[in-house]
Design a protein with these regions (language model features):
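C-terminal ends and interior cores of transmembrane alpha-helices
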Residues: 76-91
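Helix-to-loop junctions at the C-terminal end of transmembrane segments
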Residues: 54-67, 153
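Residue-level signature of mid-helix packing/kink "hotspots" within the transmembrane helices
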Residues: 48-56, 142-143
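Glycine-rich segments within core transmembrane alpha-helices of 12-TM secondary carriers
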Residues: 129-149
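Cytoplasmic helix-loop-helix junction between adjacent transmembrane helices
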Residues: 98-136
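C-terminal membrane-cytosol helix-exit motif in multi-pass small-molecule transporters
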Residues: 150, 169-179
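Helix-loop junctions at membrane interfaces in 12-TM secondary transporters
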Residues: 3, 87-99
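Helix-loop boundary and gating motifs at the non-cytosolic
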Residues: 1-52
Length: 179
């Protein structure tokens, strides 16, 4: 298997770990930040809107310029989103938190392209194995993400749940080195 496919698998694992962190804590944070519990899922909705809005444009951008540029933009979007989410948590502001999750959604939408990048990196005979390897990064992330969210939840005692988004920022920084 080409070395780049392994790097793509690690990068997808990082992005998916970030998604698992968000899924683990977003609604709980939304409930704490909203005046009305009815709005507690708005941040998660915002993330999915970001994902949906990013998927097709990022695919075109990667096709026209390069996959690397798209993945770098995805990482930066994730970092911006995680930082805005932290600001929302610190200032008890549902709007900032929701906008932050919109940007993490863009990052997750970008991550959908890793499997296609694996196809470009692997010889035709190894396409199925390459996609399988890259997608297996999501299995590791399903375990690591929620665990990391719990472990970092009280990282900043004054601001519960700022820790997971600090970890998320670091994850997106690390992901920059894997494509």
């Amino acid at each position: 298997m080409p070395k780049n496919v392994w790097w793509l698998a690690i990068a997808l694992a990082l992005f998916t770990t970030g998604n698992a962190i968000v899924l683990s804590v977003a609604v709980v944070i939304g409930e704490k930040l909203s005046v009305d519990p009815t709005y507690s899922t708005v941040p998660l909705l915002s993330q999915y809107i970001g994902l949906i809005m990013a998927t097709i444009p990022i695919a075109y951008l990667m096709q026209k310029y390069s996959r690397k540029l798209g993945f770098i933009l995805g990482s930066f979007s994730g970092m911006i989103g995680a930082i805005l989410s932290i600001v929302g948590i610190i200032y008890y502001n549902l709007t900032y938190f929701s906008i932050g999750l919109f940007f993490t959604g863009i990052a997750i939408g970008t991550a959908q392209q890793f499997r296609f990048a694996a196809l470009e990196e692997a010889p035709k005979a190894l396409h199925a194995k390459a996609v399988g390897l890259v997608m297996s990064g999501g299995i590791a992330a399903a375990l690591i993400g929620p665990t990391l969210a719990v472990m970092t939840q009280r990282f900043f005692t004054e601001y519960p749940f700022a820790g997971p988004f600090s970890a998320l920022t670091l994850i997106y920084v690390i992901a920059l080195f894997y494509y």
